[in-house]
């Protein structure tokens, strides 16, 4: 709850409404056309649909007992197999697979993950009391094995969407992700890295993190991403992990752009470069 309030306060200071005209430019056609004439177009949200012929996949290895580094993707997108967010996830998964890492992709909608903290499981999630719920045990086992946890979701309300946030709250429970000590709370996921991949449609200001603006309102872009960094640092630190940053795609190819394929390929190249920087060069 405190993370949501903090993020809301930080982002509200950016006067997002001032940029409303730009906010839809990435995913909304600039001219009207009958729906029957437009295929695979999502003109209402920033989670754009990728034309079927341009979609990619990743053959996740799952986790073994080998000493290979392990990356856990936690994906909260109901259209993962079609969306631009899904394209980013699969691009990132293939990036790590090529480096010999083991990859596990948890499609939260596909596995029908229940994000709701109920009165019955509240005290386990918040206080670590009682038995770990059966649906949480396999998720905690994956988190325990992972060297990196990457949260992936479309930007709908400037925070993790409900299913992703619920995963954080239920899986990263007390006595698993953190505990009380005489000196205060202690994170228990030391040595792990946390990262976020988020598709957006706000300013059209950049691809990446702070400093990755494209010359369009860079100061606002950096302030926007700086607000996320405050929350990401706090969340990772709460668990004892390290925040490795986030990749925000705020340059979604317009669905009707005649150069859509080239822009999509460029987006994949930019994501690869940002991952190389954030996971390997910045160590």
What are these regions, as identified by a protein language model?
Residues 57-101, 241, 267:
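N-terminal beta1-alpha1 ligand-phosphate binding loop
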Residues 102-112, 247:
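A short beta-strand-loop structural module common to alpha/beta enzyme folds
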Residues 130-224:
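Helix-loop-strand module that forms the ligand-binding subsite of alpha/beta enzymes
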Residues 1-4:
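Positively charged n-region of N-terminal signal peptides that target proteins for export
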Residues 18-20, 25-26:
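Boundary at the C-terminal end of the N-terminal hydrophobic targeting segment
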Residues 42, 46-57, 61-63, 217-283:
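Glycine-rich phosphate/pyrophosphate-binding loop and the adjoining helix
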Residues 108-129:
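N-terminal beta-loop-helix "entrance" segment that forms/cooperates
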């Amino acid at each position: 709850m405190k993370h949501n309030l903090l993020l809301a306060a930080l982002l509200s200071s950016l006067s997002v409404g001032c940029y409303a005209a730009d906010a839809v430019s990435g995913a909304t056609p600039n001219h009207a056309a009958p729906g029957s004439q437009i295929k695979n177009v999502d003109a209402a949200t920033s989670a754009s649909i990728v034309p079927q012929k341009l979609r990619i996949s990743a053959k996740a290895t799952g986790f073994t007992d080998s000493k290979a580094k392990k990356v856990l993707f936690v994906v909260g997108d109901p259209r993962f197999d079609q969306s631009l967010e899904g394209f980013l996830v699969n691009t990132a998964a293939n990036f790590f697979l090529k480096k010999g890492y083991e990859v596990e992709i948890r499609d939260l909608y596909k596995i029908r993950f229940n994000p709701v903290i109920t009165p019955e499981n509240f005290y386990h999630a918040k206080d670590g009391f009682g038995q770990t719920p059966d649906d949480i045990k396999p998720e905690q086992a994956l988190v325990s094995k992972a060297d990196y946890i990457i949260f992936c979701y479309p930007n709908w309300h400037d925070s993790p969407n409900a299913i992703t946030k619920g995963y954080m709250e239920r899986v990263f429970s007390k006595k698993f992700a953190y505990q009380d000590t005489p000196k205060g709370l202690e994170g228990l996921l030391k040595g792990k890295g946390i990262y976020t991949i988020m598709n957006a449609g706000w300013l059209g200001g950049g691809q990446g993190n702070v400093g990755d603006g494209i010359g369009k309102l860079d100061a606002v872009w950096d302030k926007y991403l700086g607000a996320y960094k405050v929350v990401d640092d706090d969340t990772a630190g709460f668990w004892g992990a390290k925040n490795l940053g986030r990749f925000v795609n705020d340059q979604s190819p317009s669905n009707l752009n005649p150069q859509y394929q080239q822009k999509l390929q460029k987006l994949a190249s930019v994501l690869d470069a940002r991952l190389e920087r954030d996971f390997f060069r910045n160590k």
